[in-house]
Amino acid sequence: MGYVIMTFSSARMSERRARIIYIWMHLSAYKINFPFVQFPTFFSLFRLQKKAAILIKNPSPFFLFFLFPYRKNSTARTIHQINQAVALVLLCVSHHLTYLPSVPSL
């Protein structure tokens, strides 16, 4: 599944990894919380990939402010790398707060 997502993505490798982590988190939450639910369709995976791309390119200003000392003391990292670190934190937080998978009726 990750291979298909990477093939259809034109993003850079680091962004692809973050997208796959986000989608893997979604699928693992699906399996843990709702073991009777079938795997999402390709369309829903594409939607998750798009959401992950938005979070990576536009991280929250709150998280940028929160990691400001880390950015200031680390001269080897660029702003883009910091944004990716922020995005991964944001993915972990927003995954359980803002995205709830739909539960089919039994």
From Swiss-Prot:
Q: Which GO terms describe its cellular component?
A: membrane; mitochondrion
Please state what the protein is called: Uncharacterized protein YKL044W
Where do transmembrane segments lie in this chain? Answer: 85-101
Give the bilayer topology. Answer: Single-pass membrane protein
What domain of life?
Answer: Eukaryota
Does Membrane count among this protein's keywords? yes
| Compartments, as annotated in UniProt | Membrane
